[in-house]
Each structure stands twice: as C-alpha cells, then as structure tokens.
Amino acid sequence: MLSFLRLSQLGRIGVQQRFKPLIHRTLSTSCRRFSVDIAYDEIPVSRIRNFSIIAHVDHGKSTLADRLLELTGTIKKNATNKQVLDSLQVEKERGITVKAQTASLLYRYEGSDYLLNLIDTPGHVDFANEVSRSLAACDGVILLVDANEGVQAQTVANYHLARGKELVIVPVLNKIDLKNARPDAVTQELFTLFGIDPDGVLRISAKQGTGCEQVLVEIVKRLPAPDVRRGEQFRALIFDSWFDRYRGALNLVYVKDGEVRVGQEIVSCHTGKVYEVKSLAMLRPDEQKIERLVAGQVGLLGCNMRTSKESNIGDTLYLKKNKNCEPLPGFKPQQPMVFAGVYPADQSQHPYLKGAIEKLVLNDSAVTVVPDSSPALGQGWRLGFLGLLHLDVFSQRLQQEYDAEPILTAPSVTYKIKLKGIKMIAAHGGKDTIFVSNPALFPDPNSVEEYYEPYVLGTIIAPTECTGPIIGLCVERRAVQKTSINIDNDRIMTTYLMPLNEIVLDFHDQLKSISSGYASFDYEDHGYVASALVRMDVLLNGTLVDELCTVVHISKAQSHARELVLKLKELIPRQMVQIAIQATVGGKVVARETLKAYRKDVTAKLYGGDVTRRMKLLKQQAEGKKKMRAIANINVPRDTFINVLKR
C-alpha cells in the first residue's frame, strides 16, 4: 500500500505540482547503508556543499569522483565504474578530463541529509577555463595530489587559482597504496610550497576506496554552505552549456537566489530574450527530471534556446515578472593563446563543417571563431585555442562526434603591433596599436614602430639531475629564468619568462624527452613584451605566396628560412620550368633552393656528328625555356600547401 501511494504521488507531480519531488537513494554512513526517501528541495542551505576536485593531470580526480558517487549510492558499485563523469570519447581514450561535469550526491552524516554538488574539473593547463568556470559555482575544493609523483606544475597553478577565489581547500593525498608512494615527503612538499598544515592532509587510495569515506566527512565539516538567499527574487548563473539536437542549448546553472519552476518565463540579462522553462533536472550523474530548482542548488535548465549564440557562459537568468534584476558577477573568460586555420578537406563539406564547429563552440566557449579564406585551401576559419592540447582535443572531437576531417594549419600566436605614420593609423580607424594573428596580414615594416609578442610565466618541476639539459632547452627557446626553489633533495621548481611562440609547437615534448617523462610544465599569461620580430615571405620564381608567410624572431630567421625552403624543395613536384624557392626578410633573400626542371633530350633524334644541327636545337630549347619562365604559371598542388602548413 505504501509503494502504491508513492507511485500515485509521483504520477500526480507533473499535473498538480504540489507534492515534493522524492528521490529514492541508497545512502551511506561509515557503519551501514540504508534506503531513504528525500525531498531534495527541502534540504536547508546549511546542509548543501558545492565543491570541485582540482589536481594535476592523472592524479586521480575522475577515480575519486567515481568512489564518491559509489559511497553516496548515486551509482551502483561496479568494476566497470571508470571515469563515470568523463563522457566524451576523447576523455576515455586520453585518460584526461576535458569537459567539466556535474553530479549531485545525497549523503547522510550524523543523522542529517546533505546535498553535495560535485563539479568535476579538467586538470590540464589548456582547460583552465573549464576549471575557472567550475569554481564560479563552488565554495570549496579538494586539492588532490599523487602521493607518488608529488606536487606538479599544475598543482601549483590550481592551488593559486582556488586561493585567488578565496575557496576553502581540503588537501588530499591519493595513491597511497602504490609501492613507491611517499606520503610523508609529499605532505612536507605541501607545507614547503603552500604552508598547508600537515595534520590537515587526508591520505586515501581512490582506486582501492581506502579513506574515501573520510573525504565526504571532511567536505561536510570543513566546507562552508553556499551564500544564497531563498527568499529573494530568482537569479541563476550559467556556468556551462552544451547542445542537444532535439532540445537546443541546455544550460548548467547555479541558483544564487530564489527558485525557478517548469513553465515559468525567464529572461537573459545578456540578450534580453524571454524563454519558457521547458525542463529542469538534477545530474546524478544522468539527468533526473525535477519540477523546481532552489537557491544553493546546481541543475540543468532547458528553455528552448535554438541557437548556440543565445547561451552565454557567465550570463544571469531571472524571472520575467521581476523587473530590473542586477546581474550576478560572472567570471573572466580566458583569451585564446594559440591560433590555427581550419579548412574542410573538400569545399563541398564547408556547410557541414561550419555547423559542427558552431555546435562544438557552444560546448567549449573558450574557442574563438573568425571566418578566413585562402587561395590554396579555400574557405575556412581561424580558430583560437587555449593551448595545443585544447587544439588537439577540439580536432579529435570534430572527427569523432561529427565525422568531419578538417585540415588544421600549424598553430601561431597573436602579436601586438604599434603603428607609426598618420596615414597608417588612419587606415586602422585611428588606432595606433593593432593585434594580428595571421602573418599574411602584417603591415609594412616601414609603418611599424615596435612589435610585441605574448610571453608566459612558465613553471617547471623536474628531477634535479635534469636541471642542466632543461636550462639549455629554455635558453634555446629565448627563456629567462626568474626563480628556482628546491622542493626536496631530488626535485627543483624553476620559473621562466618565455615567448609563447617558442612553446606552442614542441616544447612540452622536448621537455618530457630530456627528463625521461618526469618533468611537468605549466604556464600562465604574462602579457606582451617588446621583441625584434620579422615577417618572412616565400617567393616562387619571384611571386609572393601569402599562405607560406611566417613571423619569426630575428635571431632565428636564418635557420627557419633554411628549413622552410628545403621542405618546399622536397614537396613541390618538378615542372617544365626551373623554380627558384626563396625566403626573404625585408626584401632581402636569406635562403634559396632551386628546383630543377624536367630535362627533354632534344638531341636524341640526331645521328652522326652534325655539331651545327646539335647546337641549333640546344639554342632553340634554351630560348623556349627562357620564354616559358616568363609566362608559365607554377603549379603548386594543394597537397603541398597542406603538408607545409599542417601540424
């Protein structure tokens, strides 16, 4: 009879909307597990905790999230529970978190029910935008550190990011079950670098489940409840969104004030557009439909946004009936640091690729898109990314999720240029400073007062014995050492000021190679620094090829030019005319290679020793070649451009 009554109540919720939504979950304590029905929206704010797990790549964030989901009964304990929150194929293949996910956990502690909203975060530096976005909805974080590897470069970055947002930090050492684990030494590292009290550091094994229950207890005890007001007018912050082909843009929101119900009309502060709330859901981690969201909670809101441009990360939503709503403080989105051209392999695929990019950009708002065109590659786009891994993952998602096979050009960075001359400044709308990411658009050097390139402050943590080779690599990349700290007897942390252009291609690979994989690297934006830059042009028989223009530091112009002309000589097919491949800087040729023409033996038909006839034929051939060089078009196949430009 009791079960029938419950089913009857649940059946009437959608019609009458007057019964509290009931969530049937198996909860846990350290002693026992039991089942209980909870009206989640009746949980007071004082028993809500919003938190993230932040850590270096592969320190066990997703594994710990799996254990917390199991311990709270959100998912059944199963051997197949691996990276439950990592839903993207690229995440499972690479073993990294790319897209922040959310799960609402119900936990019983000392006889009271708590709602814990776990917002998973990526660990790689390229996805710091996802981390920042996640922390906007949090009141505390778990700082997870591998007890074997110790503090890494991104651990340092994530710690300072959380401290900058004044979040409560719970330090946790993971992988204490490993044979080479050194929890005491790593605890001392946390004290040395961050001043963290060793007595407050938890020790767990997320893989084995050891100590994970204590993590839940400390979340309840140490983290503060969210600072929200349920009696005020509804306001919610959009901190993530993704696209559903049937429901349009779905928004992950953090309700700061009041409450919202299905059927109510809401307004976007950013666009001013009005929407009807079509669906509300909690993520556990799969969608579980509900009828209302209240202050302090995190949930999924669908309101029939049909285009990706309508959903803006950091936007505030409020009820239409509430006039003059004050927008919530959003968070500062990161600016792209690496740019690459993206073109369809076949121009007939342009509309399809355009739609795929638009949908992915909704799901990854850190990517910037600007239409671009190339005589060699056709119509395409110039995309901005946070880093090389970000670019790789975006390209892989295009292929896996949309069956698109785009051509990606080699990555570049954005330069700042200070102009001189009244006419040049007037031509740029009266601005004496411009930003250029495409080398082909660089202004004439005579109109430039100074060039600036983006610099980053890089942090390298590596074994002490690798210090020499690492310093050599950094000096080669024009880096300047700023600080050096001995973490312990075996590892050292150094910081360098280095040009972004020198690390976007293969710096990380080289660093891993010379340190046998033990070094970790992280960087943060340091702004623009004046630099001696030059634009390098490529000429084929005196004709400028815009697609092959590059920007290099003057100290590396000669070596880069030599590499480029040799590569072109190998890739351009031989033709009926000789081709002079030249790399020039400021009109001066700095490197040249010559591609010989096909040779036709015009004397093959001769016989005997008629030397005058032989000389006549050779003279006619020479005149014909001279004429052909003057009028012939050099045919450079599209594949050649692709092989030179692609990564």
Swiss-Prot record:
It comes from the Eukaryota. PROSITE patterns: G_TR_1, G_TR_2. GTP binds at residues 55-62, 120-124, 174-177. It comes from Culex quinquefasciatus. One of its GO terms (biological process) is positive regulation of translation. GO terms for cellular component: mitochondrial inner membrane; mitochondrial matrix. It catalyses: GTP + H2O = GDP + phosphate + H(+). The keyword Acetylation does not apply. It is found in: Mitochondrion inner membrane. GO terms for molecular function: GTP binding; GTPase activity; mitochondrial ribosome binding. Promotes mitochondrial protein synthesis. May act as a fidelity factor of the translation reaction, by catalyzing a one-codon backward translocation of tRNAs on improperly translocated ribosomes. Binds to mitochondrial ribosomes in a GTP-dependent manner. CDD domains: EF4_II, EF4_III, LepA, lepA_C. InterPro entries: EF-4, EFG_III/V, EFG_V-like, G_TR_CS, LepA_C_sf, LepA_CTD, LepA_IV, P-loop_NTPase. Its EC number is 3.6.5.-. It is a peripheral membrane protein. Residues 1-34 form a transit peptide. Keywords: GTP-binding, Hydrolase, Membrane, Mitochondrion, Mitochondrion inner membrane, Nucleotide-binding, Protein biosynthesis, Transit peptide. PANTHER family: TRANSLATION FACTOR GUF1, MITOCHONDRIAL, TRANSLATION FACTOR GUF1-RELATED. Pfam families: EFG_C, GTP_EFTU, LepA_C. This is Translation factor GUF1 homolog, mitochondrial. Its main location: mitochondrion. Residues 46-227 form the tr-type G domain. Belongs to the TRAFAC class translation factor GTPase superfamily. Classic translation factor GTPase family. LepA subfamily.
